[in-house]
């Protein structure tokens, strides 16, 4: 299949419109620093570009989120395969558009959750996805999303009770 100029333009428009939102999600999925989140998004966008001719227009957002979740999972796995561990730094809090005064504390607490639990919480409560959409993005069952979300919120509430009463 021949790649068309229209497809390149469509992909560029999609990236311009959605990149910032994808970086916000990645910054919460891969706590450490904003540069790592941007690397995850770049990897995800590269995968999306390759698949672009096959992606239906009505599913492109879901496909992009799945690419980000998969790239974040790959990043997380690669940390354990390395001999040296880099010290984590907090992401640029302004880049994730906090809704609470204690956004740095929330980001720090999210970093303490296991990767799959963090992904479920971020996709459900930061991105506002449904259980089905989150399950699709994480490639797991809806029941797994529900339990991971509930356990994640439980851990966050225990560590940060004053600000978590309105979530969930």
Residue ranges and their predicted role:
Residues 22, 26, 37-48, 67, ...:
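Short, small-hydrophobic-rich alpha-helical interface motif
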Residues 4, 32, 43-60, 78-80:
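Sigma70-family region 2
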Residues 59, 66-88, 99:
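Arg/Lys-rich amphipathic alpha helix in sigma70-family domain 2
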Residues 69, 138-162:
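DNA-recognition helix of helix-turn-helix
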Residues 3, 111, 115, 127-144:
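Helix-turn-helix DNA-binding module
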Residues 120-124:
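A short pre-motif secondary-structure segment
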Residues 14-34, 50-51, 110:
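Amphipathic, Lys/Arg- and hydrophobic-enriched alpha-helical face
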Residues 2, 6-9, 81-111:
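Acidic, proline/glycine-rich intrinsically disordered inter-domain spacer in sigma factors
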């Amino acid at each position: 299949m021949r790649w068309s100029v229209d497809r390149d333009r469509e992909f560029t428009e999609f990236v311009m419109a959605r990149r910032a939102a994808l970086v916000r999600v990645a910054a919460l999925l891969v706590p450490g620093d904003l540069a790592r989140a941007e690397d995850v998004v770049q990897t995800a966008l590269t995968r999306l570009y390759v698949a672009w001719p096959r992606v239906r227009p009505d599913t492109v957002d879901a496909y992009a989120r799945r690419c980000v979740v998969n790239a974040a999972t790959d990043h997380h796995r690669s940390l354990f395969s390395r001999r040296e561990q880099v010290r984590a730094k907090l992401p640029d809090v302004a880049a994730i558009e906090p809704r609470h005064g204690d956004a740095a504390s929330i980001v720090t607490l999210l970093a303490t959750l296991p990767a799959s639990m963090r992904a479920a919480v971020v996709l459900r409560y930061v991105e506002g996805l449904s259980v089905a959409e989150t399950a699709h993005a994480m490639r797991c069952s809806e029941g797994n999303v529900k339990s991971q979300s509930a356990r994640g919120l439980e851990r966050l509430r225990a560590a940060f009770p004053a600000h978590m009463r309105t979530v969930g």
